[in-house]
Amino acid sequence: LDLDSRILIEPCAVLIHAVERAKTTGILRFNSRVAVQGCGPIGLICIAILRTMGIENITAVDGNQARLEFAKRMGATKTVNFMEHKGIEELTKAVEDSFDGHLADFAFQCTGNPKAHANIYKFIRNGGGLCELGFFINGGDAQINPHFDLCAKEINLVGSWVYTLRDYATTFDFLKRAKGIGLPLADLITDKYPLEEINEALKKNLEMTGLKIAIVNK
């Protein structure tokens, strides 16, 4: 693996683990309609992994148009900018329209925003599945209605937390496969800093104007 691929091993392992968790529901399949909410590095890598699995009906949801355009490069077939829609009903309709009048069979929630977690249930069909992996840290409580959002829809919900050693081995295969089909994973690394400029790198990361910020020792 080249240096850029090696830089991406750790975040990609997070998504390999999440997708493997999602597969345990039996709902994530070759022909599934999949919504991915959040187009930061985690969401973008999620889309890339789904594409390497052969899943082609993927809608990306985010409020940043530049990141949505990047999502298309990673394999998303449709995008929905939530900034262009007023209220959850209108946003849900946009997601439904992106799947030609259907709700998602499965969804990945890749943000740490409690409101985003509450919203995503609306995007999923009855009997569908959801993998929540956005809350690596405590982002606060999410307000959902268990009757309407979980029970009545019989949603299959799985959580995902980082990765295992086995996921690392699978990640190597994914990175080779992604490169082989032309997915621009290396473009996720928007900025590289030498070790002596680590403070500048951390500042850039906090500004959230890039995607993956790498510190590369000379």
Protein language model regions, located:
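Hydrophobic/small residue at the entry helix of a nucleotide-binding pocket
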Residues: 14, 42, 50
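Local beta-strand N-terminus motif with an aromatic residue
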Residues: 31, 76, 100-104, 185, ...
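NAD(P)H dinucleotide-binding glycine-rich loop of Rossmann-like/cofactor-binding domains
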Residues: 1-37
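C-terminal hydrophobic helical "lid"/dimerization subdomain
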Residues: 118-122, 165-218
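Glycine-rich phosphate-binding loop and adjacent beta-alpha segment
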Residues: 114-177, 217-218
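Glycine- and other small-residue-rich loops at beta-strand/loop junctions that grip anionic moieties
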Residues: 7, 35-39, 60, 80, ...
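Adenosine-nucleotide cofactor-binding segment
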Residues: 36-39, 51-119
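A generic alpha-to-beta junction signature in SAM-dependent methyltransferases
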Residues: 26-28, 99, 111, 123-125
